[in-house]
Amino acid sequence: MPTLPSPASPSSPPSAASSLPTSPASAADNQPHQRRDIAESFGGDAERYDRARPRYPDALMARIVAASPGPEVLDVGCGTGIAARQLTAAGCRVLGVEPDARMAELARRLDTGVAVDVARFEEWEPGERQFDAVVSGTAWHWIDPVAGAAKAAGVLRPRGLLSVFWNVALLPADLTGAVADACERVMPDSPFDFRAALTRPAAVPYRAILDKTADGIRTADGFGGTEQWRYDWEFTYTRAAWLDVMPTQGAFTRLPAEELAEVLEAAGSAIDARGGSITMPYATMAITAKRK
């Protein structure tokens, strides 16, 4: 399993990199939170998801802990508990909210200190519970940006922290091209715009999601100004390790086995041409705000 090092001194990723659409950010409707079929598909292989998905930079976790007025954290769309476990290790007490019962069950099993309520965040009933921080790791795009921000404001204590963040893999153009070619062959009707990913500037990955998130926070009117944090780092994957990551991405979670195998073979061949491994630049990007 790729265990990620803490990014000690971030450096800018190569300008040739592209961001593969691992969520429906480039879908025609640009409303990923309405795609419940994709949002709740990750539990089909929850153990692979937890094994293969990258962790978040230690520096980001430390900054969240430092900015939070206390240790009580709500993790929205917690999945298998990747960010939740990192935060509990940093001394926080974490409650997760997760719409997929399969993901929630694994999160509880992997860390008995993490409780998880199964619900869509917009419909979740918090009762009298309040929190010092609300976080969301690579999941906020599945939540209505205005309703989600309003819900977060409602459960945060005064000056509580909202921090939502994404790990964005900046794939080299040769790998992205090989994957896009295969995807267009096997998924001609996909809502994901794979070809557009080839020309998306690496300097602004997930820009539409980040802008929509910030706009939602402003519209909800429960927070002060937003800040954007960014951490650049890289990790070297073997061929097998990267092919373990790919089926956990939203573009591929519902793909039939035969079509998925064709996409993975294309990616594997591109990695083989690079000598059997690939050093993947990542940008971990966060939008944060303090409750009024």
Predicted regions mapped to residue ranges:
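A short SAM/SAH-binding and catalytic strip from SAM-dependent methyltransferases
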Residues: 133-146
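Class I SAM-dependent methyltransferase SAM/SAH-binding core
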Residues: 80-124
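Conserved class I S-adenosyl-L-methionine
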Residues: 2-5, 22-68, 70-77
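Conserved catalytic/acceptor-binding region of the Class I
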Residues: 157-232
